Structure formats: structure tokens, C-alpha cells
């Protein structure tokens, strides 16, 4: 991490975390941070960051069409937190089902969480990778539809224990079809790294 502060604040921070809570400086980490900060000075990065947020906002609006509840009603950054309490699947099962469909998401807790962190009520999605690939609104419309389809397909197995649920998902021809469609979309937007 990088902390920006005045000298007085740095002294207080150092007294509160040294020794034991903070390691020494790692030059490779510092170099990486410097390169990353240098990248942010390019106009292309500003465009990329802006498009990443636009993509997240558009994905929110598309998911809301399928009655997915977005925590806080929307987003102003690259992340989306979906409250799944109105859906049959919660975070752990839904994230795993999406994984088999080729869509990476994280189970996540949310404000006023009533479930355990091991099986939370929410799902977190991010848009940096789809933005890096060059995807925009038309592709996000497809992604939102696939997310909804995965929920609809896998809801029938909600009452199963996790291992049995996972076996149903990974042997589902419908999920395999979505995974193939996701892969085809990604092939049309290859990563240039």
C-alpha cells in the first residue's frame, strides 16, 4: 500500500504500526507502484477508467431489468455489489455457478449481512477486465442476460448441499452452452497483454 500524509501524520502512523505490523520496503513493490502511478498520467488511462465506470453503471442498469437488487442502487466505481436476498441462490452457490458459465464473480457480504461470510447474501462483479478487452454496452447486455440465465437455470438446485449443487451445475448442458457463448465473446475481444 501507499500512504500519502504530512510528516506529523507519518510519525503517528509509524509509531502505531512499527514494529510487527509493517514489513520493510520491497523495491519491486515500490517500482510497481511507480509504474502504475505513471500510467495514470496518460490520457488513455483516464479514458479507460471512465469507460470502466460507465460499463459498471450500464451493467447495473441491465441487471436491474432482471430484478437484481444493486446495493446502494448503483455504482460510481468499477465494482457492483448485488443483494441476492430476493433470489433463490445466495453468493456462494451463485458465484460458483457463474464460474462454470465462464463469468468470474465473488461471493461477498453486504451491509446488514444476515448470513455467514462463508455463504454471504451478495455477489460482487467488476468491469475492469471486460473494459480492458474493449467491451461496451452491447456486450454488457449479453453478459447481464447470461447472469440472469445462470440464476434461472441453477435455481432448481438451490436446496441441494453445495457439493451436489456443484455437480448439477458442472454437468448442465445449459450452463455449458452459456460457457461456450462467453468464450466465443472473449475470443472476439482478445486481451492484448
Predicted regions and their residues:
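Active-site C-terminal subdomain of aminotransferase-like
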Residues: 1-90, 170
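Short, well-ordered loop/turn and helix-capping segments at boundaries between secondary-structure elements
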Residues: 5-7, 19, 39-42, 86, ...
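Short secondary-structure junctions and interdomain/linker hinges
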Residues: 20, 24, 40, 44, ...
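Generic hydrophobic alpha-helical scaffold/packing signal
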Residues: 49-53, 60, 81, 95, ...
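Conserved PLP-binding catalytic core of the aspartate aminotransferase-like
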Residues: 69-137
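PLP-dependent enzyme catalytic core of the Aspartate aminotransferase-like
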Residues: 117-193
Amino acid at each position: 500500500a501507499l500512504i500519502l500524509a504530512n510528516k506529523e501524520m507519518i510519525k503517528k502512523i509509524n509509531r502505531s504500526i512499527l514494529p510487527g505490523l509493517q514489513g520493510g520496503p520491497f523495491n519491486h513493490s515500490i517500482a510497481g507502484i511507480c509504474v502504475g502511478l505513471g500510467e495514470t498520467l496518460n490520457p488513455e488511462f483516464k479514458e479507460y477508467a471512465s469507460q470502466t465506470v460507465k460499463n459498471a453503471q450500464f451493467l447495473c442498469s441491465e441487471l436491474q431489468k432482471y430484478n437484481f437488487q444493486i446495493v446502494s442502487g448503483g455504482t460510481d466505481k468499477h465494482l457492483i455489489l448485488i443483494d441476492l436476498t430476493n433470489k433463490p441462490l445466495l453468493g456462494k452457490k451463485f458465484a460458483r455457478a457463474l464460474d462454470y458459465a465462464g463469468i468470474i464473480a465473488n461471493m461477498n457480504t453486504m451491509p446488514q449481512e444476515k448470513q455467514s461470510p462463508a455463504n454471504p447474501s451478495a455477489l460482487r462483479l467488476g468491469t475492469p477486465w471486460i473494459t480492458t478487452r474493449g467491451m461496451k454496452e452491447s456486450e454488457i447486455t449479453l453478459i447481464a442476460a447470461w447472469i440472469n440465465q445462470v440464476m434461472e437455470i441453477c435455481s432448481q438446485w438451490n436446496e441441494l448441499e453445495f457439493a451436489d449443487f456443484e455437480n448439477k451445475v458442472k454437468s448442465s448442458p445449459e450452463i455449458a452452452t452459456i460457457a461456450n457463448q462467453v468464450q466465443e465473446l472473449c475470443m472476439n475481444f482478445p486481451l492484448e497483454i
